[in-house]
Amino acid sequence: MVVFVFAIMAGGFAYNVKVETTLARNAQDDHEFEWLARSGMEFSKWVLGQQMAIREETYDALNQFWAGRKFDTNDVFEGLSLQDIPIGRGHVTLEFTDVQSKFNINIANEEVLTTATELIGIDVGDAPIIVDSILDWIDRDDTPRDQGVEEDHYLEAESPYRCKNGPLDSLTELLLVNGVEPEMFWGTDPVDVQNMTRMERFRHRQANLPEYTNSFVKLFTTLGTKVNPNTCSSEVLQLFGIDPQLADQLVADRAGLDGVVGTEDDEVYRSNADFAARVGAGAQQLARLISVRSAVFQVKINTRIGERNRTKVAYIFRRNDKDIRVLFSFWE
């Protein structure tokens, strides 16, 4: 009996030691993950600065190093990679996204938002309610538009909250706006549904809801003031009132003769004037909202130590090739 008790005690002690060892190792790893992420952010800033310093390329496009292209020529990025960079005990992989490939919803007017509802596939009867409600959420007054709502509406909800009456800080604030459903926000493609919260996915499976092949999250951002025609989608170009066929062609032309984005034969728009010439009529109206040079980028910093992985997301603002700063960052 005594031997049995001691055996149990020894087993429990061994288990506790194993747990404490694992926790200690994880705590050490967490510290290293943070430094790996910081190293990744510093390298990201360097990459964006070096890209802007290339005098022959006064634009940002998807055939450049930051976007994943590998360089084999005598270039500042020669021999470098964004994939599996060894740092100490760990590795870092960087994935850049041009934030200005989307339209800033805080400067969107009724026409832009109406076009967005059409692209998303929102019912024509619901669209005016959503458009006016978004504009009422952003504007600073308490006077509702014809089909919009202001603070009184939100204070009467089961879980009351106030109307923002100011620009969105995060695009997810749209989920608080009258009429905006998670499916409209995320989209209903299988990949999009995975981005929903567990409750949103449950609701989506239970309800016979419309299919939205596009979404607010694919069209809009809350950062930057101009859209880069070298990195945006055809749908984003259509928000400017550009004909769908022309928008498709403008995007297809970027890929060059081989039809593959990110290769040497890409036909990028080297200046705003270059893009305006391709657009033709109505190009002057785009001038204040289009720029082939981007200032805000998102970078996903995928860190790995052994079998453990963590991802930090950082938003970086580039004023010039020397003044580059992290706006904010968070762990996914």
Where are these regions (language model features)?
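Compositionally biased linear targeting/interaction segments
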Residues: 1-332
